[in-house]
């Protein structure tokens, strides 16, 4: 079967992009991406292959490489350990992915592949992600990061397939195609909606015009009604 996979975006940027396209429908993908900066994942993270985004939006297909965002917290006292803190994660890790990642990191520590890590704790809460790795003195932080990206889901890919139904058939659309189809859909729906409203208002207008006409010759109408034998004659 076929399934669509469109990354989430910032709503404000999406609206601005639609408005820009309405004003200048000849805009190319690169120009549109000056307004729509790219995907905006709710879990944050780093897009490691930003240079490939124009091609992805031009074709409607591709893979976005996501990396966790890490920060180094230096110990405040000599006895304190430095920490490597994960504050944002790839979108693909939401849900059970965090626990799986913690388990994978623990396995790497146990197998001595992350020998410079002495403790792992998940301090995440409703305020955000916070996974803390306590480090040995003089730990090679860059090496630790590279191992984490290579051996765990802290680096992952999001497959893009901007598939949509157009004219009753599935079609992979690029960014301009999505914008055009969205605006065509809105135009068609709103035209149909306001046509129905217009017809209802025209019916009301005819009734009101009839009442106004009746008021202008009310005496004649009363005389006709009084002189009629029944409702059929009155009509």
Model-predicted segments: where are they?
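A short, contiguous, amphipathic alpha-helix enriched in charged residues
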Residues: 92-115
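Long, charged, helix-rich clamp/arm modules that form nucleic acid-engaging surfaces
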Residues: 40, 81, 90-94, 114-235
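Solvent-exposed loop and beta-edge segments used for protein-protein assembly and interaction
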Residues: 60-62, 78, 125-127
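Conserved glycine-bearing catalytic or ligand-binding loops at nucleotide- and phosphate-handling centers
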Residues: 2-65, 96-99
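Conserved helix-loop functional segments at active or binding sites
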Residues: 20, 24, 107-114, 150
């Amino acid at each position: 079967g076929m399934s669509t996979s469109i990354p989430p975006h910032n709503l404000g940027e999406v609206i601005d992009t639609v408005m820009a396209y309405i004003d200048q429908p000849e805009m190319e993908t690169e120009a549109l991406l000056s307004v729509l900066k790219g995907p905006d994942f709710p879990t944050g993270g780093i897009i490691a292959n930003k240079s490939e985004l124009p091609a992805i939006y031009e074709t409607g297909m591709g893979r976005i490489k996501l990396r966790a965002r890490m920060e180094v917290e230096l110990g405040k006292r000599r006895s304190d350990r430095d920490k490597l803190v994960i504050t944002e994660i790839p979108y693909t890790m939401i849900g059970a992915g965090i626990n799986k990642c913690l388990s994978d990191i623990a396995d790497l520590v146990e197998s001595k592949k992350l020998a410079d890590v002495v403790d792992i704790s998940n301090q995440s809460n409703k305020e955000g992600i916070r996974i803390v790795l306590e480090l040995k003195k003089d730990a090679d932080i860059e090496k630790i990061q590279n191992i984490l990206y290579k051996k765990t889901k802290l680096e992952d890919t999001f497959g893009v397939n901007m598939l949509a139904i157009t004219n009753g058939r599935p079609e992979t659309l690029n960014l301009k195609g999505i914008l055009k189809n969205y605006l065509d859909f809105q135009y068609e729906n709103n035209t149909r909606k306001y046509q129905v409203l217009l017809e209802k208002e025209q019916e009301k207008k005819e009734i009101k015009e009839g009442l106004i006409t009746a008021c202008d010759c009310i005496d004649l109408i009363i005389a006709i009604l009084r002189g009629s034998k029944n409702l059929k004659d009155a009509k």
